[in-house]
Amino acid sequence: MKRIMLFLATNLAVVLVLSVVLNIVYATTGMQPGSLSGLLVMAAVFGFGGALISLMMSKGMALRSVGGMVIESPRNETEHWLLETVGRQAQQAGIGMPTVAIYDSADINAFATGAKRDDSLVAVSTGLLHNMTRDEAEAVLAHEVSHIANGDMVTMTLMQGVVNTFVIFLSRFIANIVASNDDEEGQGTNMMVYFGVSMVLELVFGFLASFITMWYSRHREFHADAGAARLVGKEKMIAALERLKMSQESKLDGTMMAFGINGKQSLTELLMSHPPLDKRIAALRNQ
């Protein structure tokens, strides 16, 4: 219940901040909210603003959502190995030392997040540490470090911002046309039509846009696998992916799943954030 309230409060705060920003833009430019340019600006503020704020808050939100414990001073050999391995890989990849955390989950997974290459987070599940060999775990860590080095978090955020902007703009633009052509029974009826149509269209366009974002997410995974292979060798990366084939489906949600080592299954590959493991293994073998 506490997490739900925190989630709702955070989203409300984001909406309020973006509303203030939007009003400042309208006031300083003299732009009319009801104009086409005003609609586009509103779509961009909420489309990009929400994505960028989520990225800036991603480290703290990710740690809270999984109950992650940051390793500051290693208490045992495993934690010491984690810090040493991530530090070495980060140096090889040319990025700053990420914050390293462990979270309690039987799920064999890890994820990376953060707004900057030199201020990021790598989190590893206890399930991964208990069920993978050191070589396999090293490859998974290299995969996450590669995500950071490739700037995938920022690129994915920018893509999501563009997609959000077009979804909001097209939905409101079409809804305005439909509401204007509706029987003129009063302003209230038209506003109800406007909001009803825009909500439905946002759902439809959002679903269609997910094909684009999921395609890019799968594309990123191949690059992160290749980056990991360069850091630790492709045989270790292949062994890690083979191990994942024996594990359960990922329990991570949202952005954390997108930047995890393993994703969720879907009715169609087009809606998967990660390519099938067999395709990832084949791509590594063909390098």
UniProtKB/Swiss-Prot annotation:
Amino acids binding Zn(2+): 143, 147, 221
Cofactor(s) needed: Zn(2+)
Cross-referenced InterPro entries: HtpX_protease, Pept_M48_protease_HtpX, Peptidase_M48
GO cellular component: plasma membrane
GO biological process: proteolysis
Protein's name in the database: Protease HtpX
Membrane topology, record value: Multi-pass membrane protein
GO molecular function: metalloendopeptidase activity; zinc ion binding
Family listed: Belongs to the peptidase M48B family.
Transmembrane segments: 4-24, 36-56, 158-178, 192-212
CDD domains attached to this UniProt entry: M48B_HtpX_like
Cofactor binding mode and count: Binds 1 zinc ion per subunit.
Enzyme's top EC category: hydrolase
Keywords: Cell inner membrane, Cell membrane, Hydrolase, Membrane, Metal-binding, Metalloprotease, Protease, Transmembrane, Transmembrane helix, Zinc
UniProt gene name: htpX
Localization of this protein: Cell inner membrane
Disulfide bonds: none
Active-site residue numbers: 144
Natural source organism: Vibrio parahaemolyticus serotype O3:K6 (strain RIMD 2210633)
EC number: 3.4.24.-
Keyword Protease annotated: yes
